[in-house]
Structure formats: structure tokens, C-alpha cells
From Swiss-Prot:
It comes from Schizosaccharomyces pombe (strain 972 / ATCC 24843). Residues 1-63 are annotated as: Disordered. One of its GO terms (cellular component) is nucleus. Residues 14-24 have a biased composition (Basic residues). Its main location: cytoplasm. The lineage of its organism: Eukaryota, Fungi, Dikarya, Ascomycota, Taphrinomycotina. Belongs to the SERF family. Residues 1-13, 25-35 have a biased composition (Basic and acidic residues). Keywords: Cytoplasm, Nucleus. It is found in: Cytoplasm; Nucleus, Nucleolus. This is SERF-like protein C1705.02.
Length: 63
């Protein structure tokens, strides 16, 4: 019994499906959002400190 190109079609379909699943983010969404929020808060804190230092006339940051 011959399957024709069904095997090749299935391989291509499975490859496409596996690539799509790799793009999907793994893990608990709540924990991921909290971690991302903490990173953004740290970045914002650093930016605020840099702006305050520039306003005071000091230049600790990049020129």
C-alpha cells in the first residue's frame, strides 16, 4: 500500500506546528508578568536616578 506524499506533508505540518509552539512563551503567565514588571520598575528607577543626577549638575551616567 502506497501513501504517496502523505508522509512528507505530515512532516511539514509537524515542523510548522513545532515551530509555532516554540514561539509561545512557557511558564505561568502571572509569574512572567510579575517578573517583567519588576524589570521595568528597575529600569524606570535607574532612569529617574539618572535624570535627577543630571538635574543636580552631576554627570554620573553616559555622556
Amino acid at each position: 500500500m502506497s501513501r504517496g506524499n502523505q508522509r512528507d506533508v505530515d512532516r511539514a505540518r509537524n515542523l510548522k506546528k513545532s515551530q509555532a509552539s516554540k514561539k509561545k512563551q512557557a511558564g505561568d503567565p502571572t509569574k512572567r508578568l510579575e517578573a517583567q514588571a519588576e524589570i521595568m520598575r528597575a529600569k524606570q528607577r535607574a532612569a529617574d536616578e539618572r535624570k535627577a543626577a543630571e538635574a543636580n549638575g552631576g554627570s554620573k551616567g553616559k555622556k
